Amino acid sequence: MNTNNNGFVKMWDNWSKRRSSVPVYDLWLDEYKEILESNKDNEIFDLGCGIGADTLYLIERGYNVLSCDFSNEALKSIQDNIPNSKTLYLDMMKKFPIKDNTYSLIIADLSLHYFDNETTIHIMREIKRILKNNGILLSRVASVNDFNFGAGVGEELERNYYFEGDYTKRFFDFEDINKYFGIIGSVEAEETQMTRNEDEYLKP
């Protein structure tokens, strides 16, 4: 497992500083309204939350959220811009500081596609460990068809996993989805197109 991630953290700190304002979210979680409402009384775990777009979406709708990231700048941005937020420093490359069988719902939005095979497997096992029986992970990852955001660009280090100059990124096909997310349990997946305000979004 590659644990030398100082450069990766620095990159995300810089990215978060450039976007240290109230985050702008899209409405992808609207599709999962029933799942969210069934967790109205539970704390939702926002894994790799960045500056808190999904955190803001959830808090505005009355949900209790723990926002987790390994960028202190991202966590600071959440604390500064989202009232009633709770944050936790968490490095996904290490064991999560969470007890087994804690969460009924975990959200990992565009945060699981930056890691090599070994690390990705580790992360999926950790997610499985902290999920309760019949718990749910809602996640979005980059697709092999995501050509606007780097699919197939750079040095291919592993199948569908590229070094793009400043960082690494994995682009998933359905085989990858089943390989990795299947570690957690049964998988439901679809490929969709995201709509973003490009003024609010910067790579990676």
Regions found by a protein language model. Name each.
Residues 121-133:
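A short glycine-rich, Lys/Arg-flanked "PGG" loop and its adjoining helix->strand segment in the class I
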Residues 104-119:
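A short SAM/SAH-binding and catalytic strip from SAM-dependent methyltransferases
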Residues 1-40, 50-95, 122, 138-204:
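Class I (Rossmann-like) S-adenosyl-L-methionine-dependent methyltransferase catalytic domain
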Residues 97-99, 116, 173:
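GHKL-family ATP-binding catalytic core of two-component histidine kinases
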Residues 96-106:
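A short acidic, Gly/Pro-enriched loop at the edge of an enzyme's catalytic core
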Residues 46:
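Class I SAM-dependent methyltransferase core
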